[in-house]
């Protein structure tokens, strides 16, 4: 009996449920017309709400604000529902015609039910979006980093007071432009650097801080280039714009921002409007600060109350000197502290001199050495009046204490470059080797190592400073006062000014007048506007001639080279309009170093092949060059650079290169499969290979690129190739590196590749760029790498990924990345939703890691290993929209 009751209850419930379902379906069909009308009206209201909101957002963004994330999400949902509504509305007529029985029934109940249900659900979604579309705030101040923290010397003494004074003055509402003036070496740049770094640490509403080094050679296009790089104007299209067009772009961008512009080392008035800098006002809150040696420059910039940066007082000077010398040296003899005070006093409170002399004296632990320093400083102080003139001889004491004549000569050589120039280390060492300062006859690797040791010595002596690392190249700089001292020494303390003629960055239109060419040993005319070089100067002692970066230069007469029998180094690089060389270059019988890179020379003169002592020949990026046939006549060549040439590299040319028995360094570009095969089969050339570019090899010619072990290979570029895989020719154990010196790899336009697992065998890789390769799915393939017990990318500093639509993985597990500074994910990398990071990654690199992305939604899609990883690295993510 109980069972019957149970069945009756179950049947009742079932009937009720079926009834409700039928009524709901009937409701969807019966109310299609009414719901469609309501949906249409609701969509119109939603669009109006969206348009009003967008106007508010646009106004806020023009004022330099950034739209709230909830605004982005809401607008995205509106865009989606609008698209769905359009699809729904497109079938409206058909669906209404399907209804019958006065709209109560349908000729196809299932289709009408589905359509009616979609209308009903969409109406609810639209009403919900309308209710959530009211925002009290639509934007907030931009959250991206305002500037880059700049390195400072660890020892800064005596600037605390003036720093606070300068900061308060700059931040005062009445201050628009602040000028800092003082003699060279007094600490103006250090003070401006501290101001820059304080902006980076202070939440004061400033959106962007821009640092530009101007120097004596004021060039508008260079300043615009630096500013453009800071604010995201990069790429070929922008670089090709005129100065006026760039000024408009910069003005339009900065007019919407609260910016701070810091100009270091200006020598004359800077026309801010020509650059595109808006006038700072109380309304826009923008600021400009600059440093200069001359008070008159401050007045020309409209600053009539500049701040003078003065030499340190006696107590601060002594404190700085003590810190540089160190307690161990000062306590090595009871008389040394008293003598050391006299040496510090001779530095006249100039921080640069205190730093340089302090470094020099740090290893002097006998009273005799300290007495000698006092004698030198007091003697010069008596002979010179002005502080600047007195400082140069005192700085010379550090030069005199350099360990050898070769180190001294290498130091003086650095003064040939323009003021504030970044000097590429390896290029400088190549000069030194060819000049004979370093013995490079036996072992190039050992000679380069000695060059780096000399650079280290000069940096430790504070005579050079580290200039940083850019594009995989390391640089040094020379302080302008130290450079003045070096030029003073090179001219035999100004007794023979024509010994070393340096007119770098002087905007010369012609070769300078020289009283006596016969005594000139070195001449630097870098970065001028010289158009033609004529005449036949008699230069029996000239060994070095720098003519690079004279972009107006079109002609050099043959007579010019006739009387330079001892010329060893000739640099003609970056003379982009120079289309030929005279045959009389053969007269340069002592020439060892010749650089013609980035010139427009089409044919090498026959006379060049007579330069039997030539060791270093750089022909890179000579896009007009037709041939280098006959290069094997230059039997003494050790370095040949042939990257980025448009000429066809033939097998016969490779055979000529093989005949160069002294060849040690080769950079080369390959654009044919036969030449590539010839190159990789040549043990001699592979052994010398330092940089290689492989371009435009189609899939049929090279399906699989097999690379041998190349111990000295540093850079690889593979572009526009159709190979399906890159593999390693294995002759050693699986874990040994095939490319121990490979540091930079660029892969672009290789649409057959699916992974780059071969990079496992490049343990010192620092830069990896992968662009526009449509089939790459993994950087390191888990399947291929499963048998290799190698942790990749331990030295990687920069990882740039662009236009890789199929990329899903960099590596399947988190990696330590102890050196990683930047990850850049741009343009169509939508399937890459996870980075190989965890909370322990980048411990050494610390908070320096920057993750840049170009897709506004990527930051929301990215998956993190865990909450700790997300908290650690999410603040590092920055939206950067730019072209490659």
UniProtKB/Swiss-Prot annotation:
Q: Which UniProt keywords apply?
A: ATP-binding, Coiled coil, Leucine-rich repeat, Nucleotide-binding, Plant defense, Repeat
Q: Which SUPFAM superfamilies match?
A: L domain-like, P-loop containing nucleoside triphosphate hydrolases
Can you tell me which residues bind ATP? 182-189
The NB-ARC domain extends over: 139-443
GO cellular component annotations of the record: plasma membrane
Q: Where are the LRR repeats?
A: 519-540, 541-563, 566-588, 590-612, 613-635, 644-664
Q: Which InterPro entries match?
A: Apaf_helical, LRR_dom_sf, LRR_R13L4/SHOC2-like, NB-ARC, P-loop_NTPase, Plant_NBS-LRR, WH-like_DNA-bd_sf
A single Gene Ontology MF term assigned here is: ADP binding
| Gene Ontology BP terms | defense response
Family listed: Belongs to the disease resistance NB-LRR family.
Q: What does this protein do?
A: Probable disease resistance protein.
According to the UniProt entry, the note on domains is:
The LRR repeats probably act as specificity determinant of pathogen recognition.
Protein name, UniProt field: Probable disease resistance protein At1g12290
